């Protein structure tokens, strides 16, 4: 089963209406559509699919927690398996945020590059940057139909995640807040011990060149607001500039982790939300864009019960 998102259809209908009819109709903002979504349009995120990173408190003593949702199968599972092992071994405890590059990424891991990795980490091949198409009957791939993609044949959503699609298959895309695996030059693909998150304009040129393993769903402000590094590529040059990481745990092994849920991308509510993101017709906007980059349709995520 496939669900297509009519990003252009409603704009065309609206353009054909008399001015008086258009003025008489009010269009909800994307946030209003999300707020009105039915309870069963929301999908719970399992605690076992959450990575909780606690940073050292800020200069005012306030705690800083970053919550990351890991990608579901079949995407990037070799690296995600490594991340689970690293978290279980408490490997990130005592490491740090080492790089903050403006309009690009925040990166964390072992700044010394000397800390021993736990045994049993997988070596994952670059072929796993892309997932071959699996049978249509096993998936719902909601396409943002009609909106061109500069980096792929098409794009859409599966299970709450933005994906691009080409002849070779499907792959996750570098939108704001996505989390990826740092690596050296090919054929190295990284273990998952060095991670980064996007804090700027979506660097889609990295798609299929680096493994994406998740996205920040809460607390990205604790990283995006950090002082920019002054070294090459935004690395911190002094040890005291680095932000200590107190702990990283899988959600069901961490304390005081709230429940999270995302708006199902195969729901009618999400289809309406995506259309509204592509064709803004609420009060502030005079000219609907008639389309949207996939990274401009962020999947709504909230604390359960909010």
For the regions a protein language model found, what residue spans apply to each?
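Positively charged n-region of N-terminal signal peptides that target proteins for export
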Residues: 1-4
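Bacterial N-terminal signal peptides
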Residues: 6-16
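Cyclophilin-like peptidyl-prolyl cis-trans isomerases
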Residues: 21-306
């Amino acid at each position: 089963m496939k669900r297509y998102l009519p990003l252009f259809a409603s704009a065309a209908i609206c353009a054909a209406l008399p001015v008086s009819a258009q003025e008489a109709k009010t269009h909800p903002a994307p946030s209003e559509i999300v707020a009105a979504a039915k309870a069963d349009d929301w999908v719970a995120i399992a605690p076992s699919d959450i990575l909780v990173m606690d940073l050292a408190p800020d200069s005012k003593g306030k705690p800083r927690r970053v919550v990351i949702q890991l990608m579901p199968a079949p995407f990037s599972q070799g690296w995600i398996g490594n991340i689970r092992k690293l978290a279980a071994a408490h490997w990130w405890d005592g490491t740090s945020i080492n790089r903050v590059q403006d309009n690009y990424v925040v990166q964390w891991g072992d700044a010394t590059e000397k800390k021993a990795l736990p045994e049993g980490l997988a070596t994952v091949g670059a072929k796993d940057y892309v997932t071959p198409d699996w049978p249509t009957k096993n998936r719902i791939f909601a396409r943002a139909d009609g909106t061109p993609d500069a980096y792929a044949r098409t794009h859409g959503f599966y299970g709450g995640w933005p994906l691009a699609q080409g002849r070779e298959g499907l792959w996750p895309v570098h939108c704001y807040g996505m989390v990826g695996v740092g690596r050296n030059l090919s054929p190295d693909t990284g273990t998952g011990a060095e991670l980064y998150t996007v804090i700027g304009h979506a660097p889609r040129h990295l798609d299929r060149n680096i493994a994406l393993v998740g996205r920040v769903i809460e607390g990205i402000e604790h990283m995006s607001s950090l002082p920019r590094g002054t070294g090459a590529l935004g690395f911190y040059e002094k040890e005291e500039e680095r932000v200590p990481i107190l702990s990283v745990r899988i959600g069901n092994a961490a304390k005081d982790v709230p429940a999270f849920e995302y708006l199902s991308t195969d729901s009618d509510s999400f289809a309406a939300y995506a259309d509204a993101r592509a064709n803004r017709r609420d009060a502030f906007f005079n000219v609907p864009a008639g389309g949207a980059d996939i990274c401009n349709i962020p999947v709504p995520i909230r604390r359960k019960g909010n």
